[in-house]
Amino acid sequence: MSDHYHYPLDASWSTEEITSVLHFLNQVELAYEAKVRAEELLKSYAAYKEIVRSKSQEKQIDREFQQASGYSTYQAVKKAREIEKGFFSLGR
């Protein structure tokens, strides 16, 4: 995963929460840079949603992450939901 940009993290999150959010964002990165298992991405998204409960905060994080990395959390989750099982890639 690239270390050329900053992740959109909330300073009020605990270490465990930051770890969960980073795991989800890493899964999104995998979807664009290689392949990711849909089930794993959806599992990490469920954990992410336990932390980022509001739709507005989720959209803000997606916007910030997309501006920094070029990767859309929304598109990755959408594709994972479409196929449900197996690997997929959103590579360019």
UniProtKB/Swiss-Prot annotation:
InterPro entries from the UniProt entry: BH2638-like_sf, UPF0223
Pfam families per UniProt: UPF0223
Lineage top rank: taxon: Bacteria
HAMAP family the UniProt entry points to: UPF0223
NCBIfam families linked: PRK04387.1
Family: Belongs to the UPF0223 family.
Protein name as annotated: UPF0223 protein Sez_0908
Organism: Streptococcus equi subsp. zooepidemicus (strain MGCS10565)
